[in-house]
UniProtKB/Swiss-Prot annotation:
Gene: NECTIN1
Record carries keyword Oxidoreductase: no
Bilayer-crossing regions: 356-376
Glycosylation sites: 36, 72, 139, 202, 286, 297, 307, 332
Protein name: Nectin-1
Residues with PTM Phosphotyrosine: 436
Description of how the protein assembles with itself and partners: (Microbial infection) Interacts with herpes pseudorabies virus/PRV envelope glycoprotein D.
Domain Ig-like C2-type per the UniProt entry, residue ranges: 145-243, 247-334
One Pfam family per UniProt: Ig_3
Protein source organism: Sus scrofa
Length: 515
């Protein structure tokens, strides 16, 4: 017994030593089982699970390749390849699993007609000696394409005024999908959607969406589409709403130009209703139709020529299975027809403001051009103005005082030019005026004048700072027929600092006041 216990202990130690030796053998870590980390496939399709043994050592012997599935913490054999015994596939995979290229380095299998139960973790294991077993695992996901459809409500959709209750109009379903689908709606309707997910026992999910709204006349014939997005697929299916509503009544035929003696006019009652209106009734505000007016279903005929008795408010009532609604129109009768302006006349009338604006702009430009010409002419005239000393606008100086004469007067001409018929050489008077001889002749020639002294008349005038306008005119009248002894250009005057040149050619002192 002691020997047997010793032998057992020695065997265990020997096995451990062999394992450690195999673990530390050169190249042991390079022996790798290569698989895909994850795979997926749809129900009913085939999937290939790859598995290979990389870089086996020459001294390592492969004894078996095994595929297993991890189930609830345990391993269940799926398929086995043994070089000595061949291929073995276990139930329930016997009819759906096969090795593609069984060998010491390749353990790839094909799993056909996938089922939801095939989803899980699969292990590919290579048994070697003396290195031991090498394995890797992959995750297989089985997907289920959903079945999608849309259906409208079986109830009748009716638009009723005063009712705000939302009713179910359509349901969109994406059934038995794995993973679940994403459901949405595409529409111009002003409703709201609600969603529900149902998890089925087999792992699939059914998504249901219901669309609700308050029916209205505007919702009739509107499109409502269900959109289902699943994986890389997109499903779209739509329906058209059928909303029933009361008639919406309008009356046509009155063009605003009904006049006396007009013929062949009528009114037509049009009702927008679902279902269509089946009954029409014509009345007036007075209750009865005028003489010569005849109602035929939806049309009101005016027999014979129009007269004033046919004027009034006409009412049409339309009825369908949902209800009765009415519309009205007021008919006015005029004595004479109204002739609207032809379109071409209206178009020309619209162009009148443009023509007027163009004329006004042209006139303004012409006025500006003329004013500019006048301004330019005045500026040129101002620069070339020589002065006019005979105007009444002057404050006339006496020609002798310091206040009435510029400080720097141009030099007197030494030789004055007289007409050819003049025999005597005359001496110029002060300021180039008449000579002393002429003054003496005017006084009668009896007076004597001191040689070299000023004439008494000039001496008296020199004492006056200026002449009045009347005196200036009188002096001009007295000297009107005379000519200046000489002429000069006012622009060439060297004006004193206390004198200011005026626009009219005159000079005004800055030091004296003029009244």
């Amino acid at each position: 017994m002691a020997r047997m216990g010793l032998a057992g202990a020695a065997g265990r130690w020997w096995g451990l030593a062999l394992g450690l030796t195999a673990f530390f053998l050169p190249g042991a870590h390079t022996q790798v089982v290569q698989v895909n980390d994850s795979m997926y496939g749809f129900i009913g399709t085939d999937v290939v699970l790859h598995c290979s043994f990389a870089n086996p050592l020459p001294g390592v012997k492969i004894t078996q390749v095994t595929w297993q599935k991890a189930t609830n913490g345990s391993k269940q054999n799926v398929a086995i390849y043994n070089p000595a015994m061949g291929v073995s596939v276990l139930a329930p995979y016997r009819e759906r699993v096969e090795f593609l290229r069984p060998s010491f380095t390749d353990g790839t299998i094909r799993l056909s007609r996938l089922e939801l139960e095939d989803e899980g973790v699969y292990i590919c294991e290579f048994a070697t000696f003396p290195a031991g077993n090498r394995e890797s695992q992959l995750n297989l996901t089985v997907m289920a394409k959903p079945t999608n459809w849309i259906e409208g409500t079986q109830a009748v959709l009716r638009a009723k005024k005063g009712k705000d209750d939302k009713v179910l109009v359509a349901t969109c379903t994406s059934a038995n999908g794995k993973p679940p689908s994403v459901v949405s709606w595409e529409t111009h309707l002003k409703g709201e959607a609600e969603y529900q997910e149902i998890r089925n026992p087999n792992g699939t999910v059914t998504v249901i969406s219901r669309y609700r709204l308050v029916p209205s006349r505007e919702d009739h014939r509107q499109s409502l589409a269900c959109i289902v997005n699943y994986h890389m697929d997109r499903f779209r299916e739509s329906l058209t709403l059928n909303v029933q509503y009361e008639p919406e009544v309008t009356i046509e035929g009155f063009d605003g130009n009904w006049y006396l003696q007009r013929m062949d006019v009528k009114l037509t009652c049009k009702a927008d209703a679902n279902p269509p209106a089946t009954e029409y009734h014509w009345t007036t505000l007075n209750g009865s139709l005028p003489k010569g007016v005849e109602a035929q279903n939806r049309t009101l005929f005016f027999r014979g020529p129009i007269n004033y008795s046919m004027a009034g408010t006409y009412i049409c009532e339309a009825t369908n299975p949902i209800g009765t609604r009415s519309g009205q129109v007021e008919v006015n009768i005029t004595e004479f027809p109204y002739t609207p302006s032809p379109p071409e006349h209206g178009r020309r009338a619209g162009q009148v403001p443009t023509a007027i604006i163009g004329g006004v702009v042209g006139s303004i430009l012409l006025v500006l051009f003329v004013v500019g010409g006048i301004v330019v002419a005045l500026c040129r005239r101002r620069h070339t103005f020589k002065g006019d000393y005979s105007t009444k606008k002057h404050v006339y100086g006496n020609g002798y005082s310091k206040a009435g004469i510029p400080q720097h007067h141009p030099p007197m001409a030494q030789n004055l030019q007289y007409p050819e018929d003049s025999d005597d050489e005359k001496k110029a008077g002060p300021l180039g005026g008449s000579s002393y001889e002429e003054e003496e002749e005017e006084e009668g020639g009896g007076g004597e004048r001191k040689v070299g002294g000023p004439h008494p008349k000039y001496d008296e005038d020199a004492k006056r700072p200026y002449f009045t306008v009347d005196e200036a005119e009188a002096r001009q009248d007295g000297y009107g027929d005379r000519t200046l002894g000489y002429q000069y250009d006012p622009e060439q005057l060297d004006l004193a600092e206390n004198m200011v040149s005026q626009n009219d050619g005159s000079f005004i002192s800055k030091k004296e006041w003029y009244v």
